């Protein structure tokens, strides 16, 4: 199945060009659609409802096209991420089958706006054979993305979708608008239709248990006239008894009494509290002899320390200071042999000599 005209580098470059081109087109078409919505609001304000409906179909087409471009951009990015598989494998990998077939299918439908997309499709056909490319263009192989085929189809959008667009545009621009009652009556009861029909209306209508992720919750079955009954309340658990910690395990018998009771010890009596406080010595008797009777001492009798020598007690009340000599008011006269020079008062050499003599003697 390996094609002879396949060039890997050319495919890689054009995939990147397709991604950039698609991004620019998406941005451009989104801005144009916003401006077109203002024109539709003007038509509604002027009472030109039919003209507004036709204009809305163009906007829906552009929105579909933008969504299709986003899908193709995603597939191109996927091929670039797995480009090593395209180069190394001769057969088509199953994880790339949808991406490759969708790009080949969309190339002839968008090559007028994205010319690089045709080059990408040709390279893929050269890689996986032209027969494979023919099957992809007609979707006989069945791997083309269904959502992309719906967005690029030539069918007219549903009338209910057109009315939804008109209602939203009138609401955004504060324009009065009365939707078509016939079209609104055809809408499914209880189903909120999106602005862009994604083809999930049948799934929503069918409903049924097990479709939601409610942790085992069963959806209520619809009643008559599309009225959905209120769901039954969830059963509340019965209140449990409060938690109680187990009692600590201990000896079954303790002095004949059960565990947890208290009784005073019969053989031990606390000391009696004296009725009057003990008397203390006065401060005046601090110098007196302090004797404590041996009966007041509890426990073994301590050894008596050596008695210090007694000294006469001083009587501070009769203490008299002795008379001190009077301070002389004249300086003593210098001796006759003393020299008045400060340098002759002390002879350091003589002192050093005497100090050395003392050291020798010792």
Swiss-Prot record:
Task: Give the stretches traversing the membrane.
Answer: none
Positions the record marks as coiled coil are none
The record describes the protein's role as:
ESCRT-III-like protein involved in cytokinesis, nuclear envelope reassembly and endosomal tubulation. Is required for efficient abscission during cytokinesis. Involved in recruiting VPS4A and/or VPS4B to the midbody of dividing cells. During late anaphase, involved in nuclear envelope reassembly and mitotic spindle disassembly together with the ESCRT-III complex: IST1 acts by mediating the recruitment of SPAST to the nuclear membrane, leading to microtubule severing. Recruited to the reforming nuclear envelope (NE) during anaphase by LEMD2.
Report the superkingdom from the record: Eukaryota
GO MF, any single term? MIT domain binding
Q: How does it assemble?
A: Interacts with CHMP1A, CHMP1B, VPS4A and VTA1. Interacts with SPAST, STAMBP, and USP8. May interact with VPS37B. May associate with the ESCRT-I complex. Interacts with MITD1, in competition with VSP4. Interacts with SPART (via MIT domain); leading to the recruitment of SPART to midbodies. Interacts with SPAST.
Phosphotyrosine-modified residues are 43
Q: Per its record, how is this protein called by name? A: IST1 homolog
Tell me, what's a Pfam family for it? Ist1
Residue spans with biased composition (Pro residues)? 302-311
């Amino acid at each position: 199945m390996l094609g002879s005209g396949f060039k890997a580098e050319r495919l890689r470059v054009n995939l990147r060009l397709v991604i950039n081109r698609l991004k620019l087109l998406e941005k451009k078409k989104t801005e144009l659609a916003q401006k077109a919505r203002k024109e539709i609001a003007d038509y509604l304000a002027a009472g030109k409802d039919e003209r507004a409906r036709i204009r809305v179909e163009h906007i829906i087409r552009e929105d579909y096209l933008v969504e299709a471009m986003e899908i193709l951009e995603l597939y191109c990015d996927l091929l670039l991420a797995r480009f090593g598989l395209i180069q190394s494998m001769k057969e088509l990998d199953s994880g790339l089958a949808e991406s490759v077939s969708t790009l080949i299918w969309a190339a002839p439908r968008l090559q007028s706006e994205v010319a690089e997309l045709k080059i990408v499709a040709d390279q893929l056909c050269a890689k996986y054979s032209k027969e494979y490319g023919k099957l992809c263009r007609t979707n006989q192989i069945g791997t083309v993305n269904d959502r992309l085929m719906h967005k690029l189809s030539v069918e007219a959008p549903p009338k209910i979708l057109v009315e939804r667009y008109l209602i939203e545009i009138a609401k955004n621009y504060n324009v009065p608008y009365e939707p078509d009652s016939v079209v609104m009556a055809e809408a499914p009861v209880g189903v909120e239709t999106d602005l862009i029909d994604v083809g999930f209306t049948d799934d929503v209508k069918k409903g049924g248990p097990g479709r939601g992720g409610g942790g085992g919750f069963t959806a209520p079955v619809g009643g008559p006239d599309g009225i959905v009954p209120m769901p039954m309340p969830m059963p509340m658990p019965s209140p449990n008894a409060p938690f109680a910690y187990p009692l600590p395990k201990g000896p079954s018998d303790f002095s004949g009494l059960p565990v947890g009771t208290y009784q005073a010890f019969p053989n031990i009596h606390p000391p009696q509290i004296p009725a009057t406080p003990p008397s203390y010595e006065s401060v005046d008797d601090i110098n007196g002899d302090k004797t404590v009777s041996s009966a007041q001492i509890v426990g073994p009798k301590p050894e008596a320390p050596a008695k210090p020598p007694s000294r006469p007690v001083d009587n501070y009340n009769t203490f008299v200071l002795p008379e001190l000599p009077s301070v002389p008011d004249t300086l003593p006269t210098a001796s006759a042999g003393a020299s008045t020079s400060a340098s002759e008062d002390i002879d350091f050499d003589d002192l050093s000599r005497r100090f050395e003599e003392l050291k020798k003697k010792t």
